[in-house]
């Protein structure tokens, strides 16, 4: 049902006119660490509202860097490193403010996808595509759309998965470069909010096993994975639990229930 208007704190941002001027001159925008902006705004909103907690949904997969061998992380402001640094900043400067933490930090993207696959009432309406966000659509042309499809592919029948995107994402050969980056075949992971190569390898391995058992013809990108992949799938990912988190004890039961489901053998 949500909250009534009088219970909502509305915070607005404006674009610096100087940035618009630079854009008109041909300069490109840098990356905006949006999650860090949300962190500071939420801490302020929580303080004036008297809230005890500011709860995020950032997963452990956000900790991985984008460039192999380098500590360059497109998702730094979603990582545990940022969460810890922000908590230290909060404790040092605003000790009475709400506690800032992610309730999904113990879990990886694939575990979250397994949990979400059960909530079919939301499959037609959820979105996780930056390019299509202004139109509330899946663009079906970006690494993010491809990654989400890969994460859900072990847990949904092909027809249900394809109905979410309006197409078979694993058949889109024009996304081979992004696909190879997601799989770890190259040293560069797409600069999008996507999970780890290990998760992608496991997800596609499970999906390939499902196709082989059913006798269905594999889509092009899944065949490409089977032909090119040399990495062993880490099946322990679905039973993993990342201890690097700042979740208060009072939420232990919520986290425990999710862990019991995602770690259970199918």
What are the residue ranges of the model-derived segments?
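Nucleotide-activated chemistry modules centered on ATP-dependent adenylation/adenylyltransferase
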Residues: 1-266
